[in-house]
From Swiss-Prot:
Protein known as: Putative competence-damage inducible protein
NCBIfam families per record: cinA_nterm (TIGR00200), molyb_syn (TIGR00177), PncC_domain (TIGR00199), PRK00549.1 (NF001813)
Family, per entry: Belongs to the CinA family.
Originating gene: cinA
InterPro entries: CinA, CinA-like_C, CinA_C, CinA_KH, Competence-induced_CinA, MoaB/Mog-like_dom_sf, MoaB/Mog_dom
Organism annotation: Lysinibacillus sphaericus (strain C3-41)
Pfam families: CinA, CinA_KH, MoCF_biosynth
Length: 419
């Protein structure tokens, strides 16, 4: 099945909001084995929307609309589709009652135009909206399937995942199962990874293997179709093992894992504590770890020592070291890691220093990053990065590389790591 995602809203064309819905829907469809060849964005104009529908019908079996289901005049998705397909609109009594109760419970008057949100295409299957007012719907006509979803992501995402996706899976599978898992890699580029697994990519049938690069990470989505869930998972497990035999050294996790979550998991599993002294990342490393539940048993504390004076005052780094090597140096990163580990009494100390950009201040090229990692009483190890990107991109990548190198070091020392 081939799909096209058609987003409706002038605010998207004006750049006022980002079309995150298309990314979410595409990701969900890929798990079902549905091809998405086109993303289309149309403003709040009925004529142009109908033209876009005609084009989509010529090249897709499944057309998914986001937006334009609300109460105002510029919410015209349902009306345009109804006119285009020659079907009528009718009120869904369940949705209308819900909308009326919503206003009644809040003691607010319900304007007449809010009734419009309860209109549906006659003969369509309703997709319940548990996070808003306007219901979604699925409508089949002349070998095409139309799915209408609300625009707000907090409504669209749960509606698609829990209402539309199971119905699509049932349409596709005829009793079969499609399962999918994502392998996550760091420290290797997309091109290099593809070369390493090229034979697998060339020979793929079932399961399929699809590479993707984003934010410095590379993923491989492995998707299998089988009669049962168990059979699909067995097919995936065999393919994952085959890939791991080739590039397993670069894999850090699966599915929804992040570098931060896997780092915290490894620290907790091995009863290790960590502290950090940060310069260019200004607390971002600790912030990323702090988003993971349970991290309080591992992350003890840290300091942000942005200025050279702060490194001397709060970490006890010698002025002579800074004068000799500079604050953007391996020597400084190592000293920061060692000092913060001793200061907080942790198993691991992290030191991060560098030039995030856009201008250099320590006679080092923008994108130069030094990472220091001190583990117990060992001599600190340092890593040099040469990053290219915007300031905050460089800062985030420095954090990701820190997690990557730390997990590698711990694994080399025999600490357990889960996949």
């Amino acid at each position: 099945m081939n799909a096209e995602i058609l987003a409706v809203g002038s605010e998207l064309l004006l750049g006022q909001i980002t079309n995150t819905n298309a990314r979410f829907i595409s990701n969900q469809l890929s798990e079902l084995g549905i091809n998405v060849f086109y993303h289309t964005v149309v403003g709040d104009n009925a004529k142009r929307l109908e033209q876009a529908i005609e084009v989509a019908e010529s090249r897709a079996d499944l057309i998914i609309f986001s937006g334009g289901l609300g109460p105002t005049k510029d919410d015209l998705t349902k009306e345009t589709i109804a006119r285009h397909l020659g079907v009528s609109l009718e009120f869904d009594e369940v949705a209308l009652t819900y909308i009326e109760q919503f206003f009644a419970k809040r003691g607010r008057p319900m304007t007449e135009n809010n009734r419009k949100q309860a209109l549906i295409l006659a003969g369509s299957e309703i997709l319940a909206n548990h996070h808003g007012m306007a219901p979604g719907m699925i409508f089949n006509n002349n070998n095409h399937t139309y799915i209408l979803l609300p625009g707000p992501p907090k409504e669209l995402e749960p509606m698609f995942q829990f209402e539309a996706k199971p119905k699509l899976a049932a349409m596709l599978n005829d009793g079969g199962i499609i399962a999918s898992h994502v392998m996550r890699f760091y420290g290797i580029g997309e091109a290099e990874l593809e070369v390493q697994v090229q034979d697998i990519l060339d020979a793929q049938t079932n399961p399929t293997v699809a590479p993707l690069a984003s934010d410095g990470e590379v993923t491989l989505r492995v998707t299998a179709k089988a009669e049962t869930e168990q059979q699909a998972q067995q097919l995936i497990a065999a393919k994952v093992a085959e890939i791991q035999a080739l590039v397993g050294d670069y894999q850090y996790g699966m599915d929804d894992d992040s570098l931060a979550s896997k780092t915290v998991e490894m620290l907790l599993d091995n009863h290790l504590t960590i502290s950090a002294a940060e310069s260019l990342t200004a607390g971002l490393f600790q912030s990323e770890l702090a988003e993971i539940p349970g991290v309080g048993d591992a992350l003890i504390g840290g300091v942000v020592t942005y200025a050279a004076e702060a490194k001397v005052k709060h970490l006890g780094i010698s002025q002579e070291l800074i004068d000799t090597h500079g604050v953007v140096s391996g020597e400084c990163a190592a000293a920061m890691a060692s000092a913060v580990r001793k200061q907080f009494g942790t198993n691991i100390g992290i030191g991060l220093t560098g030039e995030a950009g856009p201008t250099a201040h320590d006679h080092q090229p923008v994108g130069t990053v030094w990472i220091g990692i001190a583990i117990n009483d060992e001599e600190p190890l340092t890593y040099l990065l040469h990053l290219s990107g915007m300031r905050n991109t460089n800062r985030l990548r420095a954090v990701k590389f820190t997690c990557h190198y730390l997990m590698q070091l711990l694994e080399e020392r025999g600490y357990t790591k889960r996949y």
